[in-house]
């Protein structure tokens, strides 16, 4: 999907894979909603995945939330029912930023430069853990790109913050969750389809998986991917224009 729109043919590709008795998993950096929310999002797009087939960066991040009072950055619609610790929602009150024991960054919906300045100021005066539950810097949407939590996490690191931890592709924790769900399948028999070199392809290759770069939908739409591969040194096993050409 691109934002809230289904990539043409994605439903047919999924049906084909299931008819071939292939195991299918969705590995997503979307952390704005819990597992049931992710399941509903795909269902609204016409794609059915069971809860066990969806692995999210949020899953990996929440496993690393410790006890204490956490300041959470997320959407108003997120009920945080899967967060099993004490928390407050961060808005634009400096004292709330200052009193928490750590920060959990789930979504940039409603986030803005003013709030980022509050976070930067609080961290600079009293450094605490920052969990970035979506490592993406940007995400392709229907009308361009949005800034994602990973962008703001790196902004903190540029200021010298040393307790920022990223979850989701390309970081290993989320891949380990997926591997656990496919424990009977060796890594070299898993193929990762994705549209980005620095998350999908890099992270999967590090796990010993095969990789397929989708070139005509998503991040590289309209660009020649070969030059980016050569510039980054990241090469997929295969390139595919679309997942259902």
Regions flagged by a language model, labelled:
Residues 1-22, 36-73, 77-245:
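Asp-based, Mg2+/Mn2+-dependent phosphohydrolase catalytic module
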Residues 30:
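Conserved phosphate/oxyanion-binding catalytic-loop motifs
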């Amino acid at each position: 999907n691109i934002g809230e729109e289904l990539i043409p043919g994605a439903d047919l590709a999924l049906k084909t894979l299931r008819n071939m008795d292939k195991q299918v998993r969705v590995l997503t950096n979307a952390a704005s909603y819990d597992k049931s929310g992710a399941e509903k999002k795909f269902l609204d797009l016409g794609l059915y995945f069971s809860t066990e087939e969806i692995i999210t960066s949020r899953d990996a991040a929440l496993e690393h939330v410790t006890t204490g009072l956490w300041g959470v950055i997320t959407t108003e619609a997120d009920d945080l029912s899967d967060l099993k610790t004490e928390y407050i929602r961060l808005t634009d009150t400096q004292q709330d930023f200052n009193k928490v024991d750590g920060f959990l960054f789930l979504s940039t919906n409603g986030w803005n430069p003013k709030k980022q300045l509050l976070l930067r100021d609080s961290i600079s005066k009293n450094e605490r853990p920052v969990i970035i539950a979506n490592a993406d810097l940007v995400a392709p949407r229907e009308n361009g790109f949005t800034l994602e939590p990973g962008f703001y996490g790196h902004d903190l690191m540029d200021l010298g913050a040393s307790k920022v931890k990223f979850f989701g592709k390309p970081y290993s924790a989320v891949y380990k969750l997926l591997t656990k769900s496919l424990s009977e399948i060796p890594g070299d028999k898993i193929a990762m389809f994705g549209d980005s070199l620095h998350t999908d392809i890099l992270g999967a290759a590090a796990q010993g998986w095969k990789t397929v770069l989708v070139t005509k939908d998503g991040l590289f739409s309209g660009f020649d991917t070969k030059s980016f591969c050569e510039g980054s040194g990241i090469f997929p096993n295969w390139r595919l224009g679309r997942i259902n050409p």
